[in-house]
Amino acid sequence: MIRKSIVLLSIALGIITLWSCGSEAGTEQQSVEDNQEAVVEEVQVETEDTEEADFIIPSALQIHTIFKSSGLKYIDGITNAPDNTSKYLSKFEKLLNFGVYSADMFYCVLNDQTQLSTQYLKSIRTLSDETGMSGIFNSAPILERFEANIGNKDSVISIMLEFQEKTDVLIAENNEEHTAMVIFTGAWLEGMYIGLDAARNSDNEMLRERLIEQMTILPNLIKGLDIQPNKNDQTKDLQAKIVALSDYFGSIEGLKGEDEYSYDVSVLETSHFQEFYKQVSAMRNEITKSKV
């Protein structure tokens, strides 16, 4: 049996003064570059595959930080409703939406929607209790500290970084790295859903470039779902849809550059982003059980 490596990537922000009302996208991007430190933890997953592979999975906070610095604005009502937790019955659904709600929480925090972000943290706590991850909240009063610091953005983001770290540590300590892949898949789909909703009707080239960079994670999502133990129809169906999205992305003529991570975004038309959105939103709405 071969071990596959998953790299859990969390972002530690130094001086969190990135999102003041008067900031320009370019200034915010420089602030991110100056003040972030990547903390990488490598963990192991047992798998039956005959080859080793590394999975790089950025945090939901990192994804939204990248999109925010690229000019993504807050869209009221686009996130998953916090009271939808009762809709999710299987552990797979709960873990996916743990990721969805994590993405929504960070999106709200970075856009000064602190009251709504508190509701998302409560939804995450509900799902963590139902999936055996209550230790994230039991080890420290994260929710209580979050509510007490609701008016201090720097403190709130620091608490969110602590939440991300505790999630990663708990998963690693319990050898549940395959769980991390399901959570990240939900977070990735939600982040891309929000970003593509803006990009499909916008000429924001920086945002579009960042979205294409995130599309390169698709092979890791596919592999991450492939290593799931006791895969059921839900897992296989979602994996098949992500494969279809990856195939469409790879079929766009002239997009792939000379090396693995080189892409010519100039060949993309608005119709391509509309198709990306169509496929991502279909998956997102299915896993969140949202009405179209």
Question: Model regions: which residues?
Answer:
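Extended amphipathic alpha-helical interaction segments
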Residues: 152-235
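Non-transmembrane, amphipathic alpha-helical segments
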Residues: 86, 90-93, 105-112, 116, ...
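A cross-kingdom marker for long, charged
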Residues: 226-292
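N-terminal Sec/ER secretory leader and immediately downstream segment
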Residues: 31-144
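Bacterial N-terminal signal peptides that target proteins for export
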Residues: 1-9
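Bacterial signal peptide processing site
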Residues: 22-25
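Secondary-structure edge/capping motif, primarily at the C-terminal ends of alpha-helices
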Residues: 105-112, 131, 171-174, 195-203, ...
